[in-house]
């Protein structure tokens, strides 16, 4: 099919959910304090708010996120997917994330931007291939391996969705810069294959 052939030449943009598409704090603000207190410290000094049942269903989009995604989706150069992680201790969050995508991106039918294009994994690096980018706020769960193809949301370079749109639509690196970066990525990838420390025993 022509559509399938065209997709082969598109850049894939993976987009994280928490604090990239989704405003985590907006959901947390709606949770009663007595419930939040149960997830604030389990003896490790860490908060586990993402384990609160139903919290993801309460969250709102990050400012500008919905319009920005629609702009990227309308650009013929890109093919969009959501690449996110869901908490292992909160099974309901996996379903809540799907429902959130359906709600805000009309993805309950095959005309939706993210219809059957939601990937939930703790190993985002498994999705690395040619012409792939990741918009993520953290270098965790394999996102750090995207290296120069990681657009780290919330940083000085990419503080908001306007800056992300400017990069992908107005300021994507030139063909010369992309060639150099692709060569660097390929070299790093081949070196990792030769590194015995990264191989399973």
Model-derived segments and spans:
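Active-site neighborhood of HAD-like aspartate-dependent phosphohydrolases
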Residues: 2-56, 159
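Flexible, charged surface loops at secondary-structure boundaries
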Residues: 5-9, 74, 125-130
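Short helix-terminating capping/connector loops at secondary-structure junctions
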Residues: 6-9, 77, 110-114
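N-terminal pre-catalytic "stem/leader" segment of glycosyltransferase-like enzymes
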Residues: 32, 75-81, 85, 192-201
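Short, flexible loop segments at the rims of nucleotide/cofactor-binding pockets, characterized by
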Residues: 56-60, 111-113
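Substrate-recognition element of Asp-dependent hydrolases with the DxDx(T/V) motif
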Residues: 60, 65-95, 101
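C-terminal cap/substrate-recognition subdomain and adjoining C-terminal extension
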Residues: 88-201
